[in-house]
Amino acid sequence: MGQVTLEPLKIPDRIRMEVTAEREWTEAANRLRARVLLPAAFAAPAPILPGEHRVFMVFNRKGGAGKTTTTLELACAWAAMGYSVRVLDCDPQDAGLSGWLEPVYPEGMAVENRKTLKDVLYGKAGLDEATYFTRYTNVYIVPSYEDCAVAEYDPSVSSERILRRAIKQSEAPVDITIVDCPPKIGKLSTYTLAIGGKIIVPSQVSALDAKSGESLRQAITDAQDDYDVETVAAVLTAWDATNIAKSVGNQMAVDYPGALVCPVRKTVDARTAPDQMKSIREFAPRSTTTRDFDQLGRLLVAPREEVAA
């Protein structure tokens, strides 16, 4: 199997976003600059030590917010930093993450022997059995497809801690698990949030996303009351210099005071990469979108080489 090894990026200062302690954009739209807004209590990220494991959940109640793109690009960014990353596709659809980041099955494995998230939920396979290589070195996936949605309504799948236990029982040497959560509030989203960890909230810069912001914030507040989770980043996907970008960004800073707010600038490459079945990082490593996701990844986790620093 020929895999693609994702390399670290060198981001020129003229491209890199300013990182600031300010919590709002005040300039006019025609002068709007992409900046990362840090929370007051922000601490520089630490590298992941050998034997340590961190969980990130990418969550939004609305489809089209950039959730799947954020999941894949952060996984690729962290792999390029030297980490092994397992992606849990918990948003089952045939045209979702598992169709974009396809699992690479062992040669000769019969279709009926291929495990998915559904098998994990039904107790027919452990998480490691359902974990497969992908086209990228150090990026693995637990795939899911439309048939997994049956677990949403099946009373026999009733333990909300099932995925949390599956991760704890895993023996795979994975540094980071990143979860593409389902947009619908239901059993599957409950299972993902019950894992515990750090929530990343992507929101597309649009009027519709602005209108849905209150219900999203309430859902995350409820999750923080019930589970061991914290919101660490709000990501403004498809960002451009407009009044709506300014409005959505400023509202996200208010809604998630403990999270960094990070724009990811819109480019043609970001729309084209899925058609080529490639991550944006592979398809256009020098694009602004790739570099913004890379900068976000480094604000959440320090590169592996810093362990020895």
Residue spans of the language-model regions?
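Cytosolic-facing regulatory segments adjacent to core modules
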Residues: 127-185
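Beta-strand-loop-alpha "switch" segments that mediate conformational coupling across diverse proteins
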Residues: 12, 238-243, 249-281, 293
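Walker A/P-loop phosphate-binding motif and the immediately C-terminal alpha-helix
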Residues: 48-93
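NTP-binding/hydrolysis catalytic cores, primarily Walker-type P-loop NTPases
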Residues: 280-309
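Extreme N-terminal, non-catalytic leader segments
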Residues: 2-61
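Phosphate-binding loop that captures ATP/GTP phosphates
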Residues: 81-85, 91-141
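Conserved catalytic-core segment of NTP-binding enzymes
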Residues: 5, 81, 86, 171-262
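Conserved nucleotide-binding/hydrolysis micro-motifs of P-loop NTPases
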Residues: 92-94, 136, 147-149, 206-207, ...
